[in-house]
Amino acid sequence: MEVNILGVIATALFIIIPTSFLLILYVKTASQEQEQ
């Protein structure tokens, strides 16, 4: 089975970008709660 490099990269970005975005939002809200 031949692996499509562009397909793998697109899938990785499709998973990593939303996940990192949610992590950043979570860290921001968590740090704000600790400050209060």
From Swiss-Prot:
The keyword Ligase does not apply. It is found in: Plastid, Chloroplast thylakoid membrane. Pfam families: PsbM (PF05151). It is a single-pass membrane protein. The keyword Transcription does not apply. One of its GO terms (biological process) is photosynthesis, light reaction. It comes from the Eukaryota. SUPFAM superfamilies: Photosystem II reaction center protein M, PsbM. InterPro entries: PSII_PsbM, PSII_PsbM_sf. Its main location: plastid. Keywords: Chloroplast, Membrane, Photosynthesis, Photosystem II, Plastid, Reaction center, Thylakoid, Transmembrane, Transmembrane helix. GO terms for cellular component: chloroplast thylakoid membrane; photosystem II. Signal peptide: none annotated. The chain crosses the membrane at residues 5-25. One of the components of the core complex of photosystem II (PSII). PSII is a light-driven water:plastoquinone oxidoreductase that uses light energy to abstract electrons from H(2)O, generating O(2) and a proton gradient subsequently used for ATP formation. It consists of a core antenna complex that captures photons, and an electron transfer chain that converts photonic excitation into a charge separation. This subunit is found at the monomer-monomer interface. PSII is composed of 1 copy each of membrane proteins PsbA, PsbB, PsbC, PsbD, PsbE, PsbF, PsbH, PsbI, PsbJ, PsbK, PsbL, PsbM, PsbT, PsbX, PsbY, PsbZ, Psb30/Ycf12, at least 3 peripheral proteins of the oxygen-evolving complex and a large number of cofactors. It forms dimeric complexes. NCBIfam families: PS_II_psbM. Belongs to the PsbM family. This is Photosystem II reaction center protein M. The gene is psbM.
